[in-house]
Amino acid sequence: MSESTTGPCHDSLKAYVREIPDYPKPGILFYDITTLIKEPVGLARTIDGITEHFLNKNIDLVVGMEARGFIFGPAVAYRLNAGFIPIRKPRKLPGETVKHTYKLEYGEDTLEIHKDAIQKAQRVLVVDDLLATGGTAVAATELVKQLGGEICGIAFVIELDFLNGRERLKDYDVYSLLHYDK
């Protein structure tokens, strides 16, 4: 089911993304979205691009992962007339939570969501800024499913195609605005 949609309209957004070599460590090329979101046109076209893909999916809730999913998720939720649910690092949410621990290259990480955030069968869109290896997105989908939500799609601003994160999400409608192959 995983699909890839990018067109000239979206590719032009790359002009707003700053490339920083050797960050956060030597050999890494970092794609900085702060230059994208500081420009009203860049931010608007990003939100519009994600929203347009999911307009007819009857989304009830948008879930965004800490931290940059919080930038795009609420705006997408507003445009889709949906609610917004944050997924956070451990001990950042005040109420009762459920958690999912997942493996990283060197260690593990955990994400949490409020236990009452999603009702059974609610239609959920997961939004984040970047798809790299897919670990964070998989953890988010597991949390949504654990609460009984139905995942209607996963949206990213940027996808690093060379890391093959999409493979881990092949059961979902994955939509990325911008693709980078290096």
Curated annotation (Swiss-Prot):
Subcellular location: Cytoplasm
Catalytic activity, reaction form: AMP + diphosphate = 5-phospho-alpha-D-ribose 1-diphosphate + adenine
Enzyme category, top tier: transferase
Pathway assignment: Purine metabolism; AMP biosynthesis via salvage pathway; AMP from adenine: step 1/1
EC assignment: 2.4.2.7
Any Gene Ontology CC annotation: cytoplasm
Cytoplasm recorded as keyword: yes
UniProt-listed InterPro entries: Ade_phspho_trans, PRibTrfase_dom, PRTase-like, UPRTase/APRTase
Origin: domain of life: Bacteria
One Pfam family, short name: Pribosyltran
Gene Ontology terms: biological process: adenine salvage; AMP salvage; purine ribonucleoside salvage
Keywords: Cytoplasm, Glycosyltransferase, Purine salvage, Transferase
GO molecular function, one term: AMP binding
Subunit comment: Homodimer.
Role played: Catalyzes a salvage reaction resulting in the formation of AMP, that is energically less costly than de novo synthesis.
Listed NCBIfam families: apt (TIGR01090), PRK02304.1-2 (NF002633), PRK02304.1-3 (NF002634), PRK02304.1-5 (NF002636)
Record-stated family: Belongs to the purine/pyrimidine phosphoribosyltransferase family.
Protein name: Adenine phosphoribosyltransferase
Source organism (scientific name): Koribacter versatilis (strain Ellin345)
Name of the gene this protein is made from: apt
